[in-house]
Amino acid sequence: MEEWRNFLDIKVINESSLVTVDNLSLQLDISSEKAQEYLNMFYQGNDFLYPIYLIHGQPIDDEINLEIDEESQPISNFPVLQYILCDKSSLQEKQSRLKSGYKTVIFALSSAPLSDFDELLPAVYEIREKDVLYKKEDADKYGFIFNENSVPRVLKKAPSTHSPQLSVPSKTSTIDKTDTRSTEKTKGKDIFSNARNQKGNSSRKNKKAPLENHKEKEPLLPKEEKLSEQAKRERDDLKNIMQLEDESVSTTSVHDSEDDNLDSNNFQLEIGTEAKSAAPDEPQEIIKSVSGGKRRGKRKVKKYATTKDEEGFLVTKEEEVWESFSEDENISTGTSNVVRNKPTTVNIATKKKNTAQSKPQQKSIMSFFGKK
């Protein structure tokens, strides 16, 4: 079975949906003329369906007058195309309203009668926009340009960006006679004479300009009103009061800052003395016994301990722990308050040297095998 027939069977007969020319052409990727032909062939094989026709042609009584220009005469009896949607029952009545030469095509197919054609109107509007009110023969006859895709251009006036002109008093421009010399007189003279004259004239004008501007200037600020004696006294009293208030505020702020500094220094001194008195010197090392040239006791050593905090994370802290010791008396040269962070370690290399010196009779293996 062909693809278009299978699609129409499923959509129109099985699903009872409306299929238009545009739907079929988009689904099968074909032209609208080919889609109209497929709808006509499918309706001939299935007479029980309800077709919707599209009729377009020139109406009998509806005619308009088209004006090309204001000066030219209007084109009378200009033809206008009309588009009508109808079902099979009202087809003959709609065709009778149009002149001969109209065209009738099947625009849509459905399995049930359709009473309202509003959902099909947008597609009809698109078809109507493609047609034009005039033909190429009319363009040749009346002399206007024929183009189906032409759109009248609407020109917008740009807003004026120029600021309104200021009212400046017009002055008569004084031109020196030296500037307006004829070309005949300047032929045999120096080339730079004209430039020198222009510089001199410009310098004279610049000297005159400030005097003229000074005359034209008007006082911008209004004249001060004459104050009475009572108003002057009140103003002077207000100034004196404001000055006294400013001086009092500045002196009080200076005294307050000095008092704050003294209080903070005293507070820091008190904290320092309290900390010193609260933390007496604790013994870092305690000797329990001394016998046989050896000292035995315990001392505080700093060690790192890992603990868990409230959230369960491991935290390393540095703590002081008592550790017992036993050492020779002559080694300890410090007092009892000495803190020993690291335990004393004996070098292994020195031990080996001492043992080698203590056994002079020991010989190497090579010397033993060398002598026989």
Curated annotation (Swiss-Prot):
Family matches, as Pfam families: CDC27
Location of the protein in the cell: Nucleus
Cystine connections: none
Residues found modified as Phosphoserine: S163
Main location: nucleus
GO molecular function: DNA-directed DNA polymerase activity
Alphabetical keyword list: Cell cycle, Cell division, DNA replication, DNA-directed DNA polymerase, Mitosis, Nucleotidyltransferase, Nucleus, Phosphoprotein, Transferase
A single BP term in Gene Ontology: mitotic DNA replication lagging strand elongation
UniProt biased composition (Polar residues): 160-173, 355-365
One GO location term (cellular component): cytosol
Region (Disordered): 156-264, 352-372
Spans through the membrane: none
Record note on what altering G57E does: Cell cycle arrest at 35 degrees Celsius
Biased composition, class Basic and acidic residues, residue ranges: 174-190, 209-239
Oligomeric form and interacting partners: Heterotetramer that consist of the pol3, cdc1, cdc27 and cdm1 subunits. Cdc27 interacts with cdc1 and is required for dimerization of the tetramer.
Name assigned to this protein: DNA polymerase delta subunit 3
Organism for this UniProt entry: Schizosaccharomyces pombe (strain 972 / ATCC 24843)
